[in-house]
């Protein structure tokens, strides 16, 4: 269940409605997503088992983390199960380089408040991150939690997409 939507959910919405034909980034970049519940439970447990003032990365390891390309493929496959997505013949978004995306977003912003400028503007703040492969180490985090287990990212994304589709991003009862 999605209780609070953020940039990730908004990006999926743009994708579903065909407003995102270009995606900044590289397919192989890992995206370190965690659920709110996971973070709350982890912090609660960390307060009991960690040294005071220690720094811990509350995230999954790179090998437990889906890439941008995998997430787009999973979302596209899930959206393709919906009749209203299929009938619009929406194509998978294409990856574009950082310079091209910046130029496009800047030109769209100069055109004023259009659907395109709004959709690109919602992605622009984190676009640079989608070009950088980061390998975040969570060894201390894993050691501190008794029952650490990363969720299956495919199952998680399918559930998120399913909820967003069912509620149409919060516009319908879930």
Positions of PLM-derived features:
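Residue-level signal for the nucleotide or nucleotide-sugar donor/cofactor binding architecture
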Residues: 3-6, 31-37, 66, 136
């Amino acid at each position: 269940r999605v209780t609070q939507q953020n940039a990730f959910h908004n990006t999926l919405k743009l994708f579903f409605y065909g407003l995102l034909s270009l995606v900044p980034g590289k397919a192989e970049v890992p995206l370190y997503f965690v659920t709110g519940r996971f973070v709350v439970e982890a912090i609660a447990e960390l307060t009991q088992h960690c040294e005071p003032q220690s720094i811990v990365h509350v995230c999954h390891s790179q090998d437990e983390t889906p890439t941008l390309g995998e997430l787009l493929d999973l979302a596209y496959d899930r959206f393709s199960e919906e009749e209203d997505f299929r009938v619009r013949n929406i194509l998978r978004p294409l990856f574009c380089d950082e310079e091209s995306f910046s130029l496009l977003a800047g030109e769209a912003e100069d055109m004023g408040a259009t659907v395109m400028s709004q959709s690109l503007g919602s992605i622009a703040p984190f676009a640079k991150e989608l070009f950088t492969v980061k390998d975040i180490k969570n060894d201390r985090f894993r050691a501190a939690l008794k029952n650490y287990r990363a969720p299956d990212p495919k199952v998680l994304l399918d559930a998120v997409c399913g909820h967003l589709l069912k509620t149409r991003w919060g516009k319908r009862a879930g």
